[in-house]
Amino acid sequence: MESPNMRKRLIEMESSLEVKKTATTVKQEPLETSSPLLASMISTAPNPPPTSPHALNYLTLLAAFRQFLHGYIQAGGDENLANTLGNYVAALPMPPNSLNPIGPLNAPKSPFKQQQKFHSIIKAVKREPVSEPAQNAGSGDSSVTLSSALGEDAVPQNRGSCTSMKPVPRFVMLPVVAAQSASPSASGPTSEIQQLREAAFGRYKNVLCVICNEWICSRNRKNHIEAHLNYRPYKCSACSYARRREIFVDQHIRTQHKGVEGVVMLSDVDLHVAMEVDRLAEECVTRTRKIIDTMQEKKDGDFGENKDFDEKALQMMLAEEAENKVVVIESVSQVRPKVANYHRRQRTKVLKKIYDTDVAKQTELKIVKDEEGGVPTMSIKLEEGFEINLEDLMKMVGAGSSITDSNEPGPSEIKKELAEV
């Protein structure tokens, strides 16, 4: 027999199992304004967070464009045109920031608003009052457009946008400040004498040597004077080779004494001779400038009509040489009256030489003793009897530099030079 306690326990266990089997129900309470967040969580399901679209960049746009071209060809489009566009796109270099996101493209504004804004900017340009009365001039308040400023009013403008605008004047009706009339001398061609004067102040190509009376290249006038003075400060220690520039001696040592130890370049720079070279080079420029300036004064002054120009130029040159017809060369013991150079000789023939050829051959050397110290110095006396004309000067200053002025004599010319000296 079951005891009462056992039966009581079975009843309690059965009742507890029945309670677990019954479904629990939630009593819905009315929504209150005091707890809106809790009410929304209970009554409605939570919405998923908004997902942003995939950011566009250069690579995605490039892939989309290729897909577009592929679809264009599949739709029956022109294959050649699509391939051409694809080649152009493939030729573009890769941008440095190809992965940066690309923003949306803003829609363009209406053309009517843009044109109104354009006209509002152009209205700042207005006509100024003209001193002389203009019969066909419009009102001073009329605006000026770009087409009117360019003289294109005959072209019909946009018919649908600017119908309310007033007619604008043409560009020819706008006041224009008259330019100052240039003087006849400034507008006309430069005179020959003016060209000579400009050339004498450093823009010429040839000057007259004060030693040999030949036209020499202006850029190489110092080299030419050094050749006259026989100034060769750089020498080879192994032989008698000497030149006026270091580069020639260095090249001689590398080629002729290659591999020989102890061969160096000897330097014997004389400052007195270097200063004399500079002085004589500047004297060449001074003489050329004085010749041109004196010819200008004589031509503009007392040149008569009955006398030939060459004859008067001869008189002027004789007077100029009388003032300074002896060129004193200081600090030099030996002077070469002629520097053998075939190219310069040919150029001098083309320029006709200011001095006569026979006079240039009669150039003589003489020793002039200084009265104070009694030291003999070398000088050049220029004979009188040369001719000059303006055409020769024009050819001199305008002669091209196609013929180089190489002051280094050739082998055959060195023999002639030694025979003359």
From Swiss-Prot:
Region (Disordered): 400-421
One GO cellular component, as annotated: nucleus
Keyword Nucleus among record annotations: yes
Subcellular location: Nucleus
Zn finger limits (C2H2-type): 207-228, 234-257
Entry keyword set: DNA-binding, Metal-binding, Nucleus, Repeat, Zinc, Zinc-finger
Transmembrane spans: none
An MF annotation (GO) of this entry: zinc ion binding
Annotated signal sequence range: none
Entry keyword Ligase: no
Name listed for the protein in its UniProt record: Putative zinc finger protein R05D3.3
